[in-house]
Amino acid sequence: MAREKAASRKKKERKNILNGIAHIRSTFNNTIVTITDASGNAISWSSAGSQGFKGSRKSTPFAAQVAAEIAAKKAMEHGVQNIEVYVKGPGSGREAALRALQAAGFNITVIKDVTPIPHNGCRPPKRRRV
């Protein structure tokens, strides 16, 4: 006997949020763009991996640009117009994602680098020998 679906997904309602915060997390392997409201609740997100890039292609600036465009498009459907941008991490997709958010038509009010820098905390991983 085939069972019916337990619970159907609730339709996403359109949130009317004017001001948002874009968090760009750019690592050496991937770039994740999350757009939240002022209290930190996620409105939309996207990453290079979720857009179909695999392996070393995830770490390219083009993949970061595509991820930022998709996240921006989803956020604009919820009415976001002004954003603050917080960039974190050393990856190659930082500037590309930032440029994609500007090109999407957002009014960017603040650009802030929030990369965590240790005051001589944990020992870093050993140097690669290639």
From Swiss-Prot:
SUPFAM superfamilies: Translational machinery components. Keywords: Ribonucleoprotein, Ribosomal protein, RNA-binding, rRNA-binding. GO terms for biological process: translation. GO terms for cellular component: ribonucleoprotein complex; ribosome. One of its GO terms (molecular function) is rRNA binding. Coiled coil: none annotated. Part of the 30S ribosomal subunit. Interacts with proteins S7 and S18. Binds to IF-3. Belongs to the universal ribosomal protein uS11 family. NCBIfam families: PRK05309.1, uS11_bact. HAMAP family: Ribosomal_uS11. Located on the platform of the 30S subunit, it bridges several disparate RNA helices of the 16S rRNA. Forms part of the Shine-Dalgarno cleft in the 70S ribosome. This is Small ribosomal subunit protein uS11. It comes from Syntrophobacter fumaroxidans (strain DSM 10017 / MPOB). The lineage of its organism: Bacteria, Pseudomonadati, Thermodesulfobacteriota, Syntrophobacteria, Syntrophobacterales.
